[in-house]
Amino acid sequence: MVCDLALGLVRRGHQVAIHCVDGSEVPGVDLITVPPPRDAAQALVMPRGRPAPQAPGVAAAIAGMFDAIRSSRPDVVSQHAFDAPAFDQARGLAALHTLHLPPLVPAVVAAAASTPAAQLATVSASMLRAWRAAGVDVGRVLRNGVEDVDVPDGAPEHLALVAGRISPEKGIEDALTAARLAGLPARVAGAVYDPAYDVDLQGAERLGELTRLELRRVMARSAVTICAVRWDEPFGLVAAEAQMAGCPVAAYDRGAAPEVVEDGVSGFLAIPDDTDSLAAAIERCLTLDRGEVRASARRRLSLAGAVDGYESALMEIASS
């Protein structure tokens, strides 16, 4: 999402630099890099998991990034790191902090609470409510968006797709169970995010990690994409990408799913944690007009719309 936003702003004539780790590649955008910290993996936030341990290497990398940012004297900073040091390092800068996750980490909640509301955004109305309930006055919602790319025409295969990172909160077991109940073979696409997570994918075709274009093409050929997440997901890019490929989505009705899936038009929502309800949603998805699915996504989930929102917010902060 960060790369897409940067490219979108560059195409509108803005000068943009991405501060990131060595090895990153974003053609068309200037990159200012730091070495990847050795403890980056242990700093990952795991929903429903144990709190992430201290990661001094990550804090040092963030400090190095912000040293470079300050020396470049930018008009405004779009900050997407979900780490308390990132908020601290940005003090005094014209910065917009996007909260891509719920208020899971006490240190991040405290850092966000001490940041002016006008400098805070989150990605859905669901997350806005969650952060405000945690005592953080978030000033705006800036929804994610996905690029509209050409996808193959033709009838989809009689297959269900489960896509995203391989981790407990994604509910892969429920998705596969519901697919079986609906009589659909399943494919699973995604990289392992939580090495400790041992999931049984027996009976499903394992596609592994795909490029974004490869995944979009698989979505275009799939009868339905199943999103059986077990937590209040902040947005749901997989669901958005599937709809943009014309693939309807069957999802649990929780988190931002009602904002991302247009129930009855681009997919169907199911009772959370109820695989029978999810199977029924899958079956109903097979009756939807895939052209209408894609049209719905273009209206609501476009990358251009997301860039519009960020451009307006960043210019407002830069001029304040």
Please name every model-derived segment:
Residues M1-S320:
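Catalytic cores of nucleotide-sugar-dependent glycosyltransferases that transfer UDP/GDP/TDP-activated
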